């Protein structure tokens, strides 16, 4: 278990650089103007559009649709292929497993049929939290997916959420500095736009929960092993003591 957990935790940590995971994200009511983007970028950050639309799926769940990402929060293809047509979709692997969906199946959302071409993992949704303040994730009733830009345009645009991801031009050295940078950025950002949500990476459950969970499991198993060793030592000690007494008698 410890070897497997260590390997998974190492792969998880390496994914931050491999998939260029965001330093945070924020959501606004309407799309930012070019002048606003320029002003915000002057605070030593690079902005990336990460717009999404949520729609109900015919199986009773909610799907969050994204365009395929190439720059930040890059997609990890687990099985099959990424969508290339406007009626194709690649969905989160865990969501697919929990809802018994296979590559080649068809999902219906908003009256449109989507052919599942592959299973993916989105690095900013390593755990499927629909809202960051949720007490627990739900990989059954909530899923994430990627579609082509043309496919995205066929969705209900009235439900479009203007979410932006950011990366610091110079990465923080530690979590303490990261918190200070995030607080300063939020303060500056709040003077320029009306924020609907602001989630720095260190507070993002969808990104951090998996790593935190694996780390805590490892610590718990180590403590458990120590307890087992102490118990075994006690039992062996009693057994040896009794054996010596019998032999002496």
Where are the regions a protein language model picked out?
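Membrane transport/envelope proteins' first extracytoplasmic loop
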Residues: 1-237, 242
């Amino acid at each position: 278990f410890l070897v497997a957990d260590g390997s998974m935790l190492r792969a998880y940590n390496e994914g931050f650089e491999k998939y260029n995971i965001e330093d945070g994200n924020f959501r606004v009511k309407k799309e930012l103007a070019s002048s606003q983007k320029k002003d915000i970028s002057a605070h030593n950050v690079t902005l990336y559009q990460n717009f999404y639309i949520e729609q109900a799926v015919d199986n009773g769940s909610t799907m969050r649709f994204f365009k395929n990402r190439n720059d930040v929060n890059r997609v990890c293809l687990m099985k099959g292929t990424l969508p290339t047509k406007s009626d194709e979709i690649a969905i989160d692997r865990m969501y697919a497993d929990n809802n018994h969906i296979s590559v080649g199946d068809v999902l219906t959302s908003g009256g449109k049929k989507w052919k599942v071409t592959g299973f993916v993992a989105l690095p900013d949704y390593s755990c499927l939290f629909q809202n960051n303040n949720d007490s627990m994730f739900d990989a059954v009733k909530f899923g994430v997916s990627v579609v082509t830009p043309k496919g995205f345009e066929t969705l209900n645009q009235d439900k479009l959420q203007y979410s932006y991801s950011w990366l610091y031009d110079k990465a923080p050295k530690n979590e303490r500095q990261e918190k200070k940078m995030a607080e300063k950025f939020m303060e500056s950002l709040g003077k320029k736009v009306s924020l609907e949500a602001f989630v720095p990476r260190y507070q993002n459950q969808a990104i951090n929960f998996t790593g935190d969970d694996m780390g805590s499991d490892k610590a718990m198993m180590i403590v458990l092993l120590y307890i087992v060793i102490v118990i075994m030592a006690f039992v062996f000690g009693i057994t040896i003591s009794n054996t010596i007494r019998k032999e002496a008698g």
